[in-house]
């Protein structure tokens, strides 16, 4: 059930995950039933409200993986156990589990919705090969979790300080030939997702991506997350099969807080 009205949630834990990234664990006033790939709106009184992907836990206590990039997320980093925030949701469509072999591709904090997805896939006895990429060794969020949950984990860094030097898509090209996966899942920078979609299409592998766009209302009203062709990230996504995104603004036009093209 979606909570349209914000409800209070207590901060249970706020831990530093890696450089400029935290994991916030919250206990809402009442359980929120969510699925991997869905998101909520996180509000801090007197500050702002932002969309955040569910990143672990369960209905009664869940985690959010948050990159520190501005005033709101800096305030998130200052939260302490016992503090109260506001949440509403869940919103959006989740990932779909299919097949017996999957490749999961994460770029930076795009890993957030993929951690619970990998956990769900393993419970469904799906063989999971994960790829996690970041700029350098200190910016690989949830690496330990992915390593524990996945059958195999490949790491890439742009500077070569850990794992393979390069990008997650460099590894993906090899994996789709080696692993012959039934499906590819991905979340991260949109440029990366475009390349993931291209590789999956070239090898005729179904692919779901979680698209990150500016989301203001979460309820399909404001239009700030419009993708064209009548699609809204908050209502029709954030998870899409890549064929749904053909002919849209995905990989091209971006929109500002008002929904106007930038």
UniProtKB/Swiss-Prot annotation:
Source organism per UniProt: Methanopyrus kandleri (strain AV19 / DSM 6324 / JCM 9639 / NBRC 100938)
Domain of life where this protein originates: Archaea
Gene3D superfamilies xref list: Nucleotide-binding domain of ferredoxin-NADP reductase (FNR) module (3.40.50.80), Translation factors (2.40.30.10)
PROSITE patterns tied to this protein: 2FE2S_FER_1 (PS00197), FAD_FR (PS51384)
Cofactor note: Binds 1 [2Fe-2S] cluster per subunit.
Binding site for [2Fe-2S] cluster: 217, 222, 225, 234
Family in the record: Belongs to the PyrK family.
Pfam families: DHODB_Fe-S_bind, NAD_binding_1
Pathway(s) per entry: Pyrimidine metabolism; UMP biosynthesis via de novo pathway; orotate from (S)-dihydroorotate (NAD(+) route): step 1/1
Annotated GO biological process: 'de novo' UMP biosynthetic process
GO molecular function, one term: electron transfer activity
UniProt function note: Responsible for channeling the electrons from the oxidation of dihydroorotate from the FMN redox center in the PyrD type B subunit to the ultimate electron acceptor NAD(+).
UniProtKB keywords: 2Fe-2S, Electron transport, FAD, Flavoprotein, Iron, Iron-sulfur, Metal-binding, Pyrimidine biosynthesis, Transport
SUPFAM superfamilies linked to this entry: Ferredoxin reductase-like, C-terminal NADP-linked domain, Riboflavin synthase domain-like
FAD-binding FR-type domain mapped to chain residues: 4-97
Protein's name according to its UniProt entry: Probable dihydroorotate dehydrogenase B (NAD(+)), electron transfer subunit
InterPro entries cross-referenced by the UniProt entry: Cyt_c3_hydrogenase_gsu (IPR012165), Dihydroorotate_DH_Fe-S-bd (IPR019480), Dihydroorotate_DHASE_ETsu (IPR023455), FAD-bd_FR_type (IPR017927), FNR_nucleotide-bd (IPR039261), OxRdtase_FAD/NAD-bd (IPR001433), PyrK_electron_transfer (IPR050353), Riboflavin_synthase-like_b-brl (IPR017938)
């Amino acid at each position: 059930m979606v909570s349209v009205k914000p409800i209070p949630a207590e901060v249970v834990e706020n831990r530093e995950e890696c450089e400029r990234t935290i994991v916030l664990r919250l206990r809402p006033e009442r359980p929120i039933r969510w699925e991997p790939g869905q998101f909520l709106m996180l509000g801090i009184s007197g500050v702002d409200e932002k969309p955040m992907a569910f990143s672990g836990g369960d209905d009664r206590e869940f985690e959010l993986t948050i990159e520190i990039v501005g005033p709101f997320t800096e305030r998130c980093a200052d939260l302490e156990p016992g503090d109260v925030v506001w949440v509403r949701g869940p919103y959006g469509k989740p990932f779909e589990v299919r097949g017996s072999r999957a490749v999961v591709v994460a770029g930076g904090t795009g890993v957030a919705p993929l951690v619970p997805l990998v956990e769900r896939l393993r419970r469904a006895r799906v063989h999971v090969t994960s790829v996690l990429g970041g700029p350098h060794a200190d910016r690989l969020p949830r690496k330990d979790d992915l390593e524990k949950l996945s059958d195999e984990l490949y790491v890439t860094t742009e500077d070569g300080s850990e794992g393979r030097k390069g990008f997650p898509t460099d590894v993906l090209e090899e994996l789709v030939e080696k692993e012959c996966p039934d499906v590819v899942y991905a979340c991260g920078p949109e440029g990366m997702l475009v390349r993931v979609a291209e590789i999956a299409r070239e090898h005729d592998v179904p692919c779901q991506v979680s698209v990150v766009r500016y989301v203001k209302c979460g309820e399909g009203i404001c239009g700030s997350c419009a993708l064209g062709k009548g699609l809204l990230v908050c209502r029709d996504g954030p998870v899409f099969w890549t064929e749904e995104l053909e002919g849209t603004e995905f990989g091209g036009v971006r929109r500002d807080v008002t929904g106007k093209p930038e």
